[in-house]
Amino acid sequence: DSLIDTDGKIKTMKYLSFNIDNINAGKILFDFYEKTGDGRYKVAMDTLRKQLAEQPRTSEGGFWHKLIYPHQMWLDGIFMASPYLAQYGNVFKDTTVNADIVNQIKLIARKTYDPKTGLFYHGWDESKTQNWANKETGCSPNFWSRSIGWYAAAVVDVLDYMPVQFEGRDSIMTIINTLAEDIVKYQEPETGVWWQVTDQNNRKGNYLESSASSLFVYFLCKAVNKGYIPVEYKAAAERGFNGLIKQFIKEEPDGSYTITNCCAVAGLGGKGNRDG
């Protein structure tokens, strides 16, 4: 609330950076607006919606991740923008958002999915000019578990707000079932959690990572509870949840709790030419 001034302006937002990460935190504003009716929150929500309306896009309509990352879609961006856009469309009766959301989800799946592993590469560069981009596919070289987790969480969350009769739901349901099938293949059998680099459990420096594991558990639990995937996945979800508690939750001397083994960042490009 302190970040929104009396006119509804988001104080820290640099609008023209077209940073898609700006959008996700706006989801909390729907609750504020519903409970208070304060017009400041509506102005802020409209600003975030306006950013997405003006966000630079790939030739097939995919949101660029940021202005400084031209022609690039990252799995992260689906989580950062699509659930917000879906909720905005539902609350304010903007039905135009649904086709756009489905296109974002399907487009990045089409560009980043690797049938050999059943996993999604972290990012895709349409221009194929980035140091990290495969010169034939434009994909980044690695499978970063948290990015896949963000994508998985996004595809179950958008369905909360998308009309049941909307034809694009079927394609999202297909993606959800593909994700579930492949995510459980990489669940570490002894601990029930997942590796930082999803498919490289024996690689030196790789480790069991808490944020990705949490997102995968969230995805599996919600997809089972909503009936999107067979109930048989409940066992994997429970094994993952128990693994989170056992592997990553640490009680401190003062009685507080810490979540451990959380990756700080694993981006693409920029300083040091990160490869995700």
Language model: regions and residue ranges:
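Surface-exposed beta-loop-beta
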Residues: 119-145, 152, 156-173
